[in-house]
Amino acid sequence: MTKNNILKIEIVLKEFGLTNLGIVVFNNRFLKKYDIAMLIGPDEPFFWDIFKKSKEFTSGVKNPLNKWSKRIIDSIAKKFSGTAFYPFQNNPIIPFYDWALNTGKFWQSPVKLLVHERRGLMVSFRGAIAFENRNNLNIQKKKNSPCLTCSAPCVRACPVNALNNNKYDVKSCMQFISKSKNSICIDGCLVRRECPIGKSYRKIEQSRFHMKHFINEVYK
């Protein structure tokens, strides 16, 4: 893997509304095989309009975003001789949170959610592509967390404090959202939306899609 190859991958990702969120270099080879992995997420606000035109979205299949992500990222991984991994797979379960913290692009926020240098708390992963050869690729050293100079509006944003006390209170969150179809949270998690970094990138329609899917997953 070289810087030139990374640029080529980023160009292809952009065609599908995706972006390179950071690269993790493994101290010990992942699965005794892979040296590095590129974390991939939506390139917002462009991502949503591209995904809406996909066959997965328009056909009404179950879990359209996961199916679309797998189709697209699998094809990109194959093109560049990598292997794709996903946050929704089970075997093996991929530690995206830990990987992200080792890219130099992410930090743990005061509410424990990951915060990205450009995407803030709205960051999300669609997948990762792992490669076997690092080729002396140098990864940017980690900067100071942007949270150090932030007033942390995320801490006070949740109406039921579902993300305090170092845990996520799913029950309280779901009960509040389910009280009304017009819940203030249906347009996206208030905690995530309060982060000043990248808060204007995500479209409301996309946030609604994610929240409705999240609710359906909890109550299925």
Q: What is the role of each PLM region?
A:
Residues 1-220:
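Non-ligating segments of multi-cofactor redox enzymes
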